[in-house]
UniProtKB/Swiss-Prot annotation:
One of its GO terms (biological process) is trans-translation. The keyword RNA-binding applies. It holds the Pfam family SmpB. This is SsrA-binding protein. It comes from the Bacteria. It comes from Rhizorhabdus wittichii (strain DSM 6014 / CCUG 31198 / JCM 15750 / NBRC 105917 / EY 4224 / RW1) (Sphingomonas wittichii). The gene is smpB. The lineage of its organism: Bacteria, Pseudomonadati, Pseudomonadota, Alphaproteobacteria, Sphingomonadales. GO terms for molecular function: RNA binding.
Length: 160
């Protein structure tokens, strides 16, 4: 019988988040991938530095790459520091890569990183989503819906 996992293994520490992704895209399918990082990149991420606001993932030659993500140079690094905007390889099973390739081949679909985090075991992970871009009227509808829900909560709170 397997031992239950300690609570510390279930925690995840979010380092970078793409907050605009949920507003700009319809998110369909979610994936979790490991990232191949250098030592100074890991240290920089542990300090909470890093941005995935304008990044995306692409499938090339049976591999998935995180493109245009920014992990600044480690402040205490020496001449062996990393390049901040280099493409980073994502670690996935072949079955997951096939799902991504098939999803991206559909018209208008893209792979968007939602967050970079360290899991309970201290491994850097990326949460990806297969997404389709929203049009302007879709964004307006989302905003109206969010405002209406907020107004409903306010009315219920004031009544009760």
């Amino acid at each position: 019988m397997a031992r239950p996992r300690p609570a510390e293994f279930e925690k995840k520490k979010v380092v970078a988040e793409n907050r605009r992704a949920r507003f700009d895209y319809f998110l369909e399918q979610f994936f979790e991938a490991g990232i191949a990082l250098t030592g100074t990149e890991v240290k920089s991420l542990r300090f909470g530095e890093g941005s995935i606001a304008e990044s995306y993932a692409e499938v090339k030659d049976d591999q998935v790459w995180l493109v245009n993500s920014n992990v600044p140079e480690f402040s205490h690094g020496n001449r062996f520091n990393h390049e901040p905007k280099r493409p980073r390889k994502l670690l996935l099973h072949a079955r997951e890569i096939d799902k991504m390739r098939n999803g991206v081949s559909r018209e208008g679909m893209t792979l968007i990183p939602l967050s970079i985090y360290f899991n309970g075991r201290g491994r850097a992970k990326v949460e990806l989503a297969l997404a389709k871009g929203k049009k302007l009227h879709d964004k307006r509808d989302t905003e109206k819906e969010r405002d209406w829900k907020r107004e409903q909560q306010r009315l219920l709170r004031d009544r009760g």
